[in-house]
A protein has these predicted regions:
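GNAT-family acyltransferases
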Residues: 1-94, 99-102, 115-119, 123, ...
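Charged catalytic carboxylate motif
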Residues: 111-112, 139
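Conserved active-site tyrosine of GNAT-family acetyltransferases
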Residues: 144
């Protein structure tokens, strides 16, 4: 399996191997990355667990797993981003992301979301990239809006966003 790297101006998104995903899914594993704050954020660990489960279930498709967000300037890992699963039958795919506390407010999440959404929408059959945020997570909502996503609905606890292909 060839692991994908998606490059943006200041960050590189490195697709996790199964071994790295397993290591990150463990409470103290680094996945082989040097983390800015010394440890991976919880959401990245959860996402790597989703990748491990997809491999075990035989549903994993290359490119549609978890990526580590790495700063180009120094190679430090600042967060994770990835897909909840491969695209569905309608061509829709959902993303999730988080960054370490020390990397927040610097535009890394917006850059990573923009890059992974552009990659996804360039894949055959993909029609839309979606994301959900907690209702009270205004920072994450701004990340999605800056990346071109449109708010499409709100429930009692979630805001749903979508970026459609051209």
């Amino acid at each position: 399996m060839t692991l994908l790297t998606i490059a943006a101006a200041r960050v590189r998104l490195h697709e996790l191997s199964l071994e790295s995903a397993r290591d990150l899914n463990a409470d103290s594993g680094s996945g082989g990355f040097a983390w800015l704050d010394g440890d991976a954020p919880d959401g990245t660990r959860t996402g790597s667990g989703t990748t491990v489960k997809a491999h075990a279930a035989g549903t994993y498709r290359e490119g549609w797993g978890t990526y580590v967000i790495v700063r180009a300037e120094d190679g430090r890992a600042v967060g994770g981003i990835g897909f909840h699963s491969a695209p569905d039958e309608e061509g829709r795919v959902e993303i999730g992301y988080d960054v370490t506390e020390g990397a927040r407010g610097r535009g890394y999440a917006t850059e990573a979301v923009t890059a992974i959404a552009a990659w996804a929408l360039s894949q055959p059959g993909v029609t839309a990239v979606t994301a959900n945020t907690d209702l009270d997570n205004a920072l994450s909502q701004r990340v999605l809006e800056r990346a071109g996503f449109v708010h499409i609905s709100t429930t009692t606890d979630l805001c749903a966003y979508e970026l459609s292909g051209i």
